[in-house]
């Protein structure tokens, strides 16, 4: 089993979003990982987010972590006003297109926990199931 993440630039509301994707064969689900506040140095490479990624991978989940707008190679400017939730929703659209049959889990650390919870609420309001 390959455990190497593939670097991607995915379409986001403000332009490309930098991401790392691991597509496991026979995955039991999809895990979207959201990072801490960029103002305080948070990126998708944060050590807690990296640990979440490995834990989800080891549990059999395909994983995707990404940088919000204005972080790393992602276009736009960080706004802490909902734009990061819009970014995460765009990533979910891409993830679901890859493996629509798999359940989705959304995880985050610190500010990423806020983004994950807000995203889960938004998706559930649209009738989507989030684990």
Locate the predicted segments by residue.
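N-terminal cap/lid segment of alpha/beta-hydrolase-fold proteins
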Residues: 1-26
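Short, surface-exposed "cap/lid" segments of acyl-processing enzymes
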Residues: 14-16, 24-65
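Glycine-rich "HGGG/HGxG" loop immediately N-terminal to the catalytic nucleophile
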Residues: 69-80
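Alpha/beta-hydrolase active-site loop
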Residues: 78-98
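Residue in the alpha/beta-hydrolase core beta-strand immediately N-terminal to the catalytic nucleophile
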Residues: 103-105, 131
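Gly/Ala-rich beta-loop-alpha elbow adjacent to hydrolase catalytic centers
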Residues: 108-116
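Active-site signature of alpha/beta-hydrolase-fold catalytic machinery across serine-
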Residues: 118-122
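A conserved short beta-strand
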Residues: 125-131
